[in-house]
Design a protein with these regions (language model features):
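Start-transfer (signal-anchor) and selected internal transmembrane alpha helices
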Residues: 5-63
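Lipid-exposed faces of alpha-helical membrane segments in multi-pass integral membrane proteins
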Residues: 23-30, 56-66, 125, 147-150, ...
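Transmembrane-helix motifs of polytopic, lipid-linked glycan transferases
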Residues: 30-40, 139-166, 183-184
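Intramembrane catalytic core of multi-pass membrane enzymes that act on lipidic substrates
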Residues: 47-145, 149
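Transmembrane-helix signature of polytopic, membrane-embedded enzymes
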Residues: 47-55, 159-180
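Internal amphipathic alpha-helical segments of the cytochrome P450 catalytic fold
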Residues: 122, 172-173, 184-185
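Short acidic/glycine- and proline-prone juxtamembrane loop motifs at membrane-interface regions
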Residues: 188-189
Length: 189
């Protein structure tokens, strides 16, 4: 699994290396916020600026799309709920601790015995991702991340259409929504 992959296993092998990675993640997050704020003043209301903001957003998002989950363990719960449903266990009656290996998936133990708060469509999609992942959590994680990224893209498209209809600066809206560090770190990473 992902935890046994050499770079991850190496950095998890020592508390000092884990702390170093945590500090680098925090510094990287701050640098991303600073880059996003500094990027703002150069945005004009024209198609070239819009393309530049979208291109920059994609460049910033790509590494986050393939990195291990950061800042939240929720995505591990999504995978576990999908596995629960795929195993034929009602997630509205049972917690993910009903499936073998739930803890090794990365689910927060605090939520392990809690019934699912997610709607039926979400759970059905999570079950499909679990099935497509063929029991390999990393595949299901990536499929969940792709779905979240697709949702973020649809959100950006919708906001850009609204901005165009209202006569607003679409490049500014793209900066606020697509390039925003919250969108990148919470929807994609």
């Amino acid at each position: 699994g992902l935890r046994e992959w050499f770079p991850i296993a190496f950095f998890r092998s020592s508390p000092d290396l884990t702390r170093l990675c945590t500090m680098l993640l925090i510094v990287g997050g701050f640098l991303l916020v600073i880059a996003w704020l500094r990027f703002r003043p150069s945005i004009r209301d024209d198609d070239a600026s819009l393309r530049r903001v979208i291109r920059t957003s994609v460049i910033w998002a790509l590494p986050l799309l393939i990195c291990v989950p950061v800042f939240s363990r929720d995505i591990f719960s999504y995978v576990a709920v999908g596995r629960l449903m795929a195993a034929g266990i009602d997630p509205y009656q049972h917690g993910v601790n009903e499936i073998a290996g739930w803890y090794s998936l990365g689910v927060d133990p605090f939520w392990s015995s809690t019934e699912s708060p997610y709607g039926p469509l979400f759970i059905a999609v999570a079950a499909v991702f679990s099935w497509l992942g063929a029991g390999i959590p990393e595949y299901a994680l990536f499929l969940n991340r792709l779905a979240a990224t697709a949702g973020a893209v649809l959100m950006v498209v919708a906001f850009l259409k609204i901005a165009a209809l209202r006569g607003r600066n679409r490049a500014f809206v793209a900066w606020m929504i697509a390039a925003n560090t919250l969108t990148l770190l919470l929807f994609i990473a």
